[in-house]
Amino acid sequence: MKKILKLFKLSSFFILILIILSRAYALETKHVDIWSDGTRMSGDIFFPLGFNIDVPNPAIIMAHGWGGKRSDLNRYFVPKFVKAGFIVLTFDYRGWEDSDSRLVIIGDQPEIDQNGEINVYAKAIREVVDPIDQTRDIFSALDFLCGEEGVDTERIGLWGTSYSGGHVIYVAAQDDRVAAIYSQVSYQGNGRNIRKNFYRQRAIEKARGVIDPIPQGIDIIPKLLGSPDLAKMLGYRPIDWAYKITVPTLIVDVEQEELFDRKKNGLSVYNIIKNNAVSKYHTFPGTHYDIYYQYFEASTNLAVQWFVKYLK
């Protein structure tokens, strides 16, 4: 009986230690609503241990890739950046996860009443991949973060992966509030032009009302979540903005990238940026999705080290 009691006490002691440690490393967070062109986006802000609003803190905005969701960022990526001393903001693009939908009026627009209001039937737009709207959402997230107490607006970084790896280049090139960039396995708009005529045909069909103004359920790419708005993708080329980047930028690729030509995208962007800013290009072996599994730890550590070096 004494041995049992002793084991029970030891077990209780170790459980208590684990609880204390888990609380010590628990992330302080709050849910936030971010407004982007009149539509609410759902987001989360995470704060480092010992956060003090009276002391300006460096911050990072994380943008997930094609069909991604912030909950995955929150679970796997965010803790590493927060433990390194950063405030982190994540969000879901409009029309994804628990962010509100963009709305399109069904039928003819009713007459406007004396208060300037109308009652309409509308279609909720969900899970459409629109690079123009998504980059607008990142700008809105940046606006929101700059109004958050305790954020040093001179030390804000952008982290983007896959399709959003191009978005962060596009945004940073146009917004001088961005102080550092990390972009991994990124498509920079420098792809093959064999489908350009089809993209243009989709734009014609939208303008003439042949297809929905924001098409859903068409042109879906196998194994990828969401409907691409091909008309919006036609002229979207972050690489064309790379020459305006003047802040430290780390580009990470995989050597056997199978979704696009990395040399025409990530490497080409690096070769442009290096002329005007501190920059680095790094590759891992493997294919696109290996960055999230086999090379998750190594790539994320590179990102943390980059932001520590240039934001802290």
Model-derived regions: residue spans:
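Primarily recognizes the serine-hydrolase "nucleophile elbow" in alpha/beta-hydrolase
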Residues: 139-205
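Conserved alpha/beta-hydrolase
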Residues: 82-102, 110, 114-117
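Serine-hydrolase catalytic core
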Residues: 218-286, 299
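Catalytic active-site module of serine/aspartate enzymes centered on a nucleophile-bearing elbow/loop
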Residues: 285-286, 293-312
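N-terminal cap/lid segment of alpha/beta-hydrolase-fold proteins
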Residues: 24-55
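Alpha/beta-hydrolase active-site loop
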Residues: 109-149
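The serine-hydrolase catalytic nucleophile loop
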Residues: 67-79, 93, 264
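Short beta-strand element of the alpha/beta-hydrolase
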Residues: 55-65
